[in-house]
């Protein structure tokens, strides 16, 4: 199933971009937002911190949607979401995230996220988030 495999790659990419060995910036992009927009930006920053701390369990349990977590777990050859994310974190280079914009529609949101690697490669992407159990969680990024 290509979609399910893409989900594993997505979470791996999230963990990777979340800085496998720690990001290069101390930028607090959530500081420029307020309310729900700040919560969304904080979720992105929390992903970066969890990856820096090599905490795949936190990424899977707290920062991605239940659907994405289940999809990754299903595709991880029985090892679970946390193991798949931990493995991805170990195999990647650091990247920093900066949330540039947030648009909210009900319990769905789109965040414009800029990522920058140690090699100064910059990409700007649209991430989607869903509000689940009172917290904004990442549901997808461009694969």
Identify the residue ranges that each predicted region occupies:
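Short, well-ordered alpha-helical segments enriched in acidic and aromatic residues
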Residues: 53-71
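Surface-exposed, charged secondary-structure patches
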Residues: 78-124, 143
